[in-house]
Amino acid sequence: MQPLVMQGCPYTLPRCHEWHAADRFHHSSSLRNTCPQPQVRAAVTIPAPPWDGAGDPCLSPKLLNGTVGATGPLEPSAMNLCWNEIKKKSHNLRARLEAFSDLSGKLQLPLREIIDWLSQKDEELSAQLPLQGDVALVQQEKETHAAFMEEVKSKGPYISSVLESAQAFLSQHPFEELEESQSESKDTSPRQRIQNLSRFVWKQATVASELWEKLTARCVDQHRHIEHTLEHLLEIQGAMEELSSTLTQAEGVRATWEPIGDLFIDSLPEHIQAIKLFKEEFSPVKDGVKLVNDLAHQLAISDVHLSMENSRALEQINIRWKQLQVSVAERLKQLQDAHRDFGPGSQHFLSTSVQVPWERAISPNKVPYYINHQAQTTCWDHPKMTELYQTLADLNNIKFSAYRTAMKLRRVQKALRLDLVTLTTALEIFNEHDLQASEHVMDVVEVIHCLTALYERLEEERGILVNVPLCVDMSLNWLLNVFDSGRSGKMRALSFKTGIACLCGTEVKEKLQYLFSQVANSGSQCDQRHLGALLHEAIQVPRQLGEVAAFGGSNVEPSVRSCFRFSTGKPVIEASQFLEWVNLEPQSMVWLAVLHRVTIAEQVKHQTKCSICRQCPIKGFRYRSLKQFNVDICQTCFLTGRASKGNKLHYPIMEYYTPTTSSENMRDFATTLKNKFRSKQYFSKHPQRGYLPVQSVLESDCSETPASSPMLPHADTHSRIEHFASRLAEMESQNCSFFNDSLSPDDSIDEDQYLLRHSSPITDREPAFGQQAPCSMATESKGELEKILAHLEDENRILQGELRRLKWQHEEAAEAPTLVEGSAEATPDHRNEELLAEARILRQHKSRLETRMQILEDHNKQLESQLQRLRELLLQPPSESDGNGSAGSSLASSPRQSEGSHPREKGQTTPDTEVADDVGSKSQDVSLCLEDIMEKLRHAFPSVRSSDVTANTLLAS
C-alpha cells in the first residue's frame, strides 16, 4: 500500500493592525453622552449625519455643540429627530453585531470539533506504539494503520474547508494586537468584542492547522516505521529458520563422532583434517548468527522488541552455536593431543622406557623428566642413565685423562647402542629429516623423530632386536646433558650431528671428514669462526664428563690458531690441512682418537704375560717398556699406575692395540738397546707426551664461537656448585695423599697425571662458564657474573692458602738436609746410611713440592687474570664488552702463544708412549726453559726470608 500523503492546511491566518472603523463605537458613546434625554428642544432641525461604510453615524460633536451653543437648547422636534436617528443607527449596529456573532459562532464550533477530533486521532496514533516484535502482529498493525490513514484522509477536505472559511473570515475582520491595558479592563466595547472574537477564531484555526500538519506527518512516519520493522522481522525470521536448519545438520554430524579412545592411532591425522574441514564448512554460520543479532539490536534501538517466541528462538540459536563451537574446539584439541601423545611423532611410546616406580613425564617445552613415586622425587636423568653415570665412577682410578675419558665414552657408546650405528646410516637419517643446515635449531620432538628413525633403521639393517624406546630415551637424555644442560628444549642441528657422529661406529678419519664438511663452505674450506664452532661443539662431549680441563678447556681459540698454522697464512683452511692437524692428535681432540683405539683394542689378545699382575694373555692395550727388555704391562696396570719394583713407568713405553709383528719387535728391541745407554737425566729432559699440546692461556672465548645450545643463565647453577665441590674434594684428597704416596715406586705417574690434568686454567675446568661465549656473557645478568666471580675468588683464596702451606713445607724440606749433614759427623757410622736415605727422600719431596708450587702459582696467575677480566666485563657496558674483551685477550695471549705449542713430529702411532728420540727441538727448548725455572725456584727457597719475598712476589703478580 502506498503511503498516504496528506496535504497540510495552506492557509495563513493574518492579523490586521489597522481597524477601518476604529472610532465608531467611541463616537456613538460620545454622542450618547452629549445629548441628554430629559430636555429636548426642536428649535433647529439637524440633518442626520451620513454613514460611512462601516455603519456608524458621522455626527460631529462640534456641529452639535455649535448648534446648541448658538441657538440655545434644541427644539423638541429636532431632538426627536436626532433620537430617532440614533435609535435607527443603534438598531442597525445591533443587527450587524448579531450577524458577526452568528458568523464567528459558526466558525468556532467546527474548529472546536476539528481540534478535538485531531487530538483524539493523535492519541490513537500514539497508542499504536510500540510495535510488537512479531511478523503477524506487525502485519496486523500495518492493516490497522492503513485504515487509520484512510479515515484521516477522508476527513481532510472538511478540515480544509473549515480552515479556508476561517481564513476568509479573518481577512474580512482583522484584529489588532491585544494591549495590556485593554486586556485588563472589564468594560469592553463592541469593537473590542469583535476583535476578541476574531482573535479567538484565529487561535482555534491556528491550533487546528498545527494539529492537522502534525497528524499527517506522524501518519507518514508511522507508516514508514511499520514497513521498516516488518522488513527486518521478515529477514530475522528467515535467517533464524536457515540457521536452525544448518545447526541441526551440524549437530547431526557431531552426534556421529566416535570417542577418542575408540579411534585408531593411524587414523588420527584423517580425523584431524575432517574436523578442520567441518569447521571451515560451517564458518558461514558465524556470519549468520552475527547478522541476526545485529538486526535484533537495531530493532531494539528503534523501540521494537522481539516477541517472547522470537527471543527464545534467537537465544537458542546463540546457545547452540556456542555449544557447537566449543565441541569442535574440544574435539580438535583432543585429536591433536592424542596424535601428539600417541601418534607416530609422539613421546608416548617412550613411556615404556622406565619401570615402576618410575614414570616418564613431559615438561611444557617437551623435555622429558622422570618421577620416582616411591621416593617422591623428580630428576632430569633417566634412571638407567643415572646408573650408567654411577658405573663411570669406577673408571676414575685411570691416571691418564685421555684414556679415562675414552673409557667412559666407550661405556656410554655401548649403553646407547651407537657403536652399532654407522655414519652412512646416520647420514641417511639426517638427509631424510632435512638436517643439512647446521644452524637449524631442533626441538625435542625433532630429535626424537631422528633418533627413532635411526634405531629403527638399525634394526632393519643389522637384524638385531633393539629396545628402541630405551635407546631413544637414553640417547635423548645424553644429548640434552651434553648440548642443552639448561633443558631449554632446543638444540642446534650441528650439535646433534656432532654428538651422533662422535659416538657412531666409524673410523676416526671419516668422522672428522664429515664434521669438517658440516662447517665448510661450498669450496670445502672453513674459516676460523666455523672451525671454532665445530671444536666448541666437540669439546662439549668430554666437558659433560667433567674431563674438559685436560683437553685445553672450553676455550677453543688456541686450538683454532694451532690448526690454522697449517693454512700457510690463508684466512681459510682446507679439509686436507685440517686432517693433517688432527692426525697429530691435538690436545682438544685427542680423546676421539683414543676412543677409536679403545674400541679396536677391546677384542685384541696379546700372547704375552703382564710383568706386574702376571695376566696372560694380555687383553686390550699392551704396553712394552723401551728401557728394559721383556717388560710388558697390561692396560689395567698401566692405566691405573700399578708398577713393580724397578719398573719405572716414566721411561719410554710403546703402546699396542693390535697384535705385534716381527718387524715391530725388532724395532722395539733396537730402541730398547739404545735407551739402555741413556741416563735418567736424559729422559727427564725429554719428557714424552702423547698429544700435540695447545698452549692454554687465559683469554675469553672468541666472540665468533657460539654457544652450543640456548641455555638459561641459571640452568647450570647446581651443576656448577657440584663441580666446585668435586674439584675441592679432589684437591683435598690429593693434598692428603700427597705425602703418603711420596714413597711409592710409581710416584712419577702421579706427577705426570697431575701435570696432565691440571695444565689448563681453572676457567677451563668450569663447564658452565667456559662453555659460554662473550656474546652470551654480554647478555647475562650482572648478578650471575657476580656469583661466578664470588666462586672464583673463593677458589683463589683456597689456592693461595695452599700455596703458602706448600712454601712452608718446602722450607722445612730445604732445611732438613742441612741438619742431617751436620748431625751425621757426630753420630756413629751405623746411622749414616739411614740419614742419607732420609735426605734422598726429602730431596724427592722437595722436588715434588716445587713442581706443585709451580702449578699452583700458574693457576693463581691465571685465576687472577680471569678475575680481572670478569671485573672489566662487569664494569663495561654490554655493547663494548665484546669488542674490548676480544682485543684484550688477543694481546694478552700473543706473547705466550708465540713461545710454544708448535706441532711436533710423531714417530709412532701410539701417542702416549712415543720414543724420546722423536721429540722436536721446540719441545726441548720448552723443557730447558722449564728446568731453568725450576732451578731458579730451588734457589729462591733456601731460607725463610727469601721464600717470603718470593711468595709475596708471586701473590702480587
UniProtKB/Swiss-Prot annotation:
Keyword Metal-binding: yes
Biased composition (Low complexity): 876-894
GO CC aspect terms: cytosol; dendrite; glutamatergic synapse; perikaryon; plasma membrane; postsynaptic density
GO terms for MF: zinc ion binding
Keyword flag Membrane: yes
Modified residues (Phosphothreonine): 910
InterPro entries with a match to the protein in the record: Dystrophin-related_2, EF-hand-dom_pair, EF-hand_dom_typ1, EF-hand_dom_typ2, KCMF1/Dystrophin, Spectrin/alpha-actinin, Spectrin_repeat, WW_dom
Source organism superkingdom: Eukaryota
Membrane topology of this protein: Peripheral membrane protein
One Pfam family linked to the record: EF-hand_3
Keyword line: Cell membrane, Cell projection, Membrane, Metal-binding, Phosphoprotein, Repeat, Synapse, Zinc, Zinc-finger
An annotated GO BP: central nervous system development
Residue numbers carrying Phosphoserine: 748
List of residues binding Zn(2+): 610, 613, 634, 637
Disulphide-bridged cysteine pairs: none
Spectrin repeats: 102-179, 231-337
General function of this protein: Required for normal myelination and for normal organization of the cytoplasm and the formation of Cajal bands in myelinating Schwann cells. Required for normal PRX location at appositions between the abaxonal surface of the myelin sheath and the Schwann cell plasma membrane. Possibly involved in membrane-cytoskeleton interactions of the central nervous system.
Oligomer status and interactors: Interacts with PRX; this enhances phosphorylation. Identified in a dystroglycan complex that contains at least PRX, DRP2, UTRN, DMD and DAG1.
Protein name per Swiss-Prot or TrEMBL: Dystrophin-related protein 2
Organism the protein comes from: Mus musculus
